[in-house]
Structure formats: structure tokens, C-alpha cells
Amino acid sequence: MSSPELLLRIAAAQRAVLAQTELLHREFGRAHSQWKADGTRVTAVDLAISAGIFRELGASFPADQFFSEELAHGDAPVPVTARFGWVLDPIDGTNNYAMGLAHCAIALALFEHGRPVYGVIYDLARRKLMHGGPGFGLLDGDQPARVLPGPLHRHSLIGFHSPVDQKHGAQARRILEAFKIRGLGSSTLHLAYVAVGILDGVIDHNVRIWDIAAAVPLVWAGGGEVQFLNGEQFPLRQFDLKMPRIFYVAGNAAVCARLREVLEA
């Protein structure tokens, strides 16, 4: 049975994300952006959404911890100590957002004891809120959703990240030869689209925890798997802007097995 504390936070998370969608749409394709030291883009909207969501949640849950790439205080890792924590990517797909490409999302994850238990993702392109977690089900807008069943076939669509690090070049060639690839420019949406049955699977070697934290519980709720290939990520012990890149596959069990087979060939 879900605790009242958890249910209160789930409802608050949905309200907090939806409260930022008007700003997200209004500034789409015209927000001023800058380049950070790590080579990633940030806009004033990223910062405003981070501040707005955490201000609202912090007022209701002051004992929780709040982690965002855009609002981190210094580069030192921050230990995860609270029962409840939040990991936010205010705009996943900032390059798309700044240039007027609609595949981008607000992605908010609720953690309990270091594990993601609920995700709330607003998909700008489809104007839909995707949300769910294990034991809570999964909604794509107002419709229940599931990971696609069955093995991969010639019409299957696989999400894949680019550019590709040279050390993954041989694997990338095999993936491109074996599957129909979709690269949307949003790691959150790649994984969330697996959860709701738009993509069959995803392979990614170049994400950090804030890129996927909100989508992982959606996949679990939708009956799928997220398999980490370079070490388990949960429970999250610390939030670190310099954490190593995560390498994972996701889909139903048969899809994950096939993707790993191609990677290991």
C-alpha cells in the first residue's frame, strides 16, 4: 500500500510540472541560450523551470532533497541522505527547444531511499503528460499505456543517441545495420516512448542520471526493463554533475536480450 507521504508528493509533482508548461510553450524556439563549460546548452527557461518547480515542491516538502543539473551548487558530489528526493531535468532536449524542434520535455523524478518510484514527464511535441511508477500504473495523457510486447521485427523502431563516441563505433555500425533507428535529441523521450509503446526499445551510451531518472519508473510501470551495462545506478548514493556516462538498453525482456546480443556480437 502506498504511503500518504508518497501520494502527496505524486500529486504535487504533477501540479508542479503542469504549472510550467505555459512558459515552456511560450518561449519555444525563441529562448536565449548560452553554452556551458561542458559543451551543453542552457536557456533562461531551463533555469526558470528548475526554480519554479523546486520552489513549489520545497514549500510543501522542505525536508526533501532537490537535484537539478541547472541548479547545482558547485561541482562537489552531494550525498543522498533524505528519504525522499527529486531529480529534475527542466528541459531535456534543450538544443531542440532552442532551435524550434518540438522533441523536448520537462522530466521530474521522485526518489524514495535512492530509488526512482515515480516519474512525471511533459512531452512538448505531443502536449501530453506521461506519468507513473511501479504499483501506480502508467498514463500517457489520460490513457493507460504499456511497453510494446513481443520480439523485435523488421518494422521495430529503436531510439539511439548521437553523436557516437569512437570507442562505441563498431557497436553503432551493427545497430544501424540491424534496426530502424530514431534519434530524437531527447534521452528522456527515447526512454519514455519505450514505456508508452511508441518505440520498441532504446540503446544509449551517453546519458547521466537526470536524463533518464523520470523515465525509468515509467518503463518499469509499463512492464519493461532498463538494463544498465556499465554498473547499476540505483540506489542513488550521491548527485554528481561529473558522474560517468550511463550505458543502457531498455524495452521488454526479449527486446533487451536482442539489443545486448547485437552489442556483444
Question: Can you say where each PLM-predicted feature lies in the sequence?
Answer:
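Active-site-adjacent structural elements in enzyme catalytic cores
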Residues: 15, 59, 75-135, 139, ...
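Oxyanion/phosphate-interacting regions
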Residues: 1-10, 14-15, 173, 192-265
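Residue-level signal for inorganic ion chemistry
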Residues: 24, 46, 57, 94, ...
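Acidic beta-strand-loop-alpha-helix segment within the catalytic core
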Residues: 108-192, 238-265
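N-terminal subdomain of lithium-sensitive/metallo-dependent phosphomonoesterases centered on the IMPase/IPPase/PAP
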Residues: 1-91, 264
